[in-house]
Amino acid sequence: MLNVTDLRGHTPSKSDIRRALPRGGTDVVSVLPIVEPVVDDVQNRGAEAALDYGEKFDHIRPASVRVPAEVLKAAEDTLDPRVREAIEESIRRVRKVHADQKPREHTTELAPGGTVTERFLPIDRVGLYVPGGNAVYPSSVIMNAVPAQEAGVGTLVVASPPQADHGGWPHPTILAACSILGVDEVWAVGGAQAVALLAFGDDSADLEPVDIITGPGNIFVTAAKRLVRGVVGTDSEAGPTEIAILADDTANPVNVAYDLISQAEHDVMAASVLITDSEQLARDVNREIEARYAITRNADRVAEALRGKQSGIVLVDDIEVGIAVADQYAAEHLEVHTANAREVSERISNAGAIFVGDFSPVPLGDYSAGSNHVLPTSGTARFSAGLSTHTFLRPVNLIEYDEAALKDISEVVINFADAEDLPAHGEAIRARFETLPTTTADTTDTPDATA
């Protein structure tokens, strides 16, 4: 089922690897002309425009953008106890990890009386996007809200598409997760129009704009984020989900097959890639996939994803080359199924998250490992990171020098200012220690304004 790319027999360069690797991705640029008018319309008409687009795309118009408190409470009250237990345990684990991520204020002394203190200040108002679509994602509520809460964010807003099956409100499980987390501002709006409304708000509807928007979404959500970036902050652009598995002949082919299948279940564009130095493992995994995928509930979706150009098996000469291939692929999720898996994992430079060994599968990270599942995709893990407490914090420096400390460094500053031909910078320093000459304006030729 999976296509095979054979890199054996030579040492591939980085360029060779990037050209050879299966990669799908999404062409965000192609949908910008579709999304830009939506964003502009919501900026101009606010909530009314967002509701109009919801009616057009989601085939339902909620009674209001903001979900009433009683609807949130009812969703929590009627939640299946087993689902509630799962949500609460996942919140506990994710909160523990993200609480430990919060950096501490620190001060550096440059000279007696001269210090720089770095403080970490939370963003004031955050918009969290939770998609609808093929599945229900209360886990995305947890993964976005908990790090923001641990950062000390002032206000959280969750936006999620209205659903005709649920009275025009977002899915009840999403609403229940919001209620359990204490998020009481939830908007029944999805897609590009949700991103625009979060960015621009609507004073007439008492919908305040946010300062940053995070959370996954489809290509239209991603395009809208690109258009509003600069008006607000955003997290990294999320393409279709992906898994890479680096494995040798010690790997269990059944487990590897199931992990590839489970990621393909998300989306027909999802990518599932096996990187291995074992031709036997490659054959075994392909056989296990063929034998098992059809019994899953989402078999058609899985099959399309696994047969797509974005998925495949990459054969390499050895694990050394496998590590290089994994680094160039820079997977959203990377599993390592090798002898000495921890040692191999520590040599990986590029991945959104690394899952070490046979008992740390990606589905654990999707829900309850404690790590965050909002991760960079499409190779962007080479230069960006997943969502964390840091996403919602701004480092701010406090510079504090006394007179002696400034005088001690003043000559350096003045010389630098002169080198850059910015003499007023130097004079701003000198004026604190000496009386600088002034120019008295000659008013003899100035017209008398009262004449």
From Swiss-Prot:
Cofactor: Zn(2+)
Record keywords, A-Z: Amino-acid biosynthesis, Histidine biosynthesis, Metal-binding, NAD, Oxidoreductase, Zinc
Organism: Corynebacterium efficiens (strain DSM 44549 / YS-314 / AJ 12310 / JCM 11189 / NBRC 100395)
Entry EC number(s): 1.1.1.23
Residues engaged in binding Zn(2+): 263, 266, 366, 425
Protein name: Histidinol dehydrogenase
Functional description taken from the UniProt entry: Catalyzes the sequential NAD-dependent oxidations of L-histidinol to L-histidinaldehyde and then to L-histidine.
Cofactor, free-text remark: Binds 1 zinc ion per subunit.
Positions annotated to bind NAD(+): 129, 193, 218
